[in-house]
């Protein structure tokens, strides 16, 4: 009996040990270590571009840092965390930088605000390249993703929808909002006027939902974004009610 208990004890310790290892390797969903990138601001407002201060840098970065944190905890607010700006990935203190001469790389670290538990842990030192004074950095939207959208349009004959009727997909309210929200996650300064939405829907029967490909492309004259991305939408047509 003692021998059996000894064997069980050994297995018990082993099982607990294994469980502990798994638990230690698991990253909590609200851990700031999940934040891997922070978008650069389009511009940095500074009273003296040759000696941009840390407070001016932080002001330019605030919106993008909040977006990055909300990518981990959607309900997080600016009061739930704090961040610091450094010269390098070793945490060397920063006082001023020269954005008159050109772009400058800085490093950010985000930690929870004192006595707050909405987020935990901390980020590594995340590199952000600040734009030269007077230049505006466009954000490439090629990696933006939008989940498949469900779209309902009106057509005079749902079994024979015309191309111009399919243009309603591009301005469908929930689809357009999903696109804008997704873009602003990486380019907070972007607006609806910075891009155009098109789709490849072919004329035909849309009484039953049919999949179309939607393309979102930055306008050439946009000061905030560049590039394009695509996603799917399921489109259904119904006749207008009299």
Swiss-Prot record:
Which top-level group of life is the source organism from?
Bacteria
Which residues form the lipid moiety-binding region (S-diacylglycerol cysteine)? 24
The residues forming the signal peptide are 1-23
GO cellular component annotations, sorted alphabetically? Answer: plasma membrane
Please give the Pfam families that the UniProt record associates with this protein.
Answer: Spiralin
Could you tell me which residues are lipidated, with the kind given as N-palmitoyl cysteine? 24
Q: What is its main location?
A: membrane
Alphabetized InterPro entries for the sequence: Lipoprotein_mollicutes-type_CS (IPR054816), Spiralin (IPR007880)
- Where is it located? Cell membrane
Alphabetically list the UniProt keywords. Cell membrane, Lipoprotein, Membrane, Palmitate, Signal
Q: How is it modified after translation?
A: Palmitate and stearate are the major lipid components.
What's the protein's topology in the membrane?
A: Lipid-anchor
Tell me the function of this protein. Major membrane protein of spiroplasma.
Give the multimer and partner information: Seems to occur as dimer, tetramers, and large oligomers of identical chains.
State the name under which the record lists this protein: Spiralin
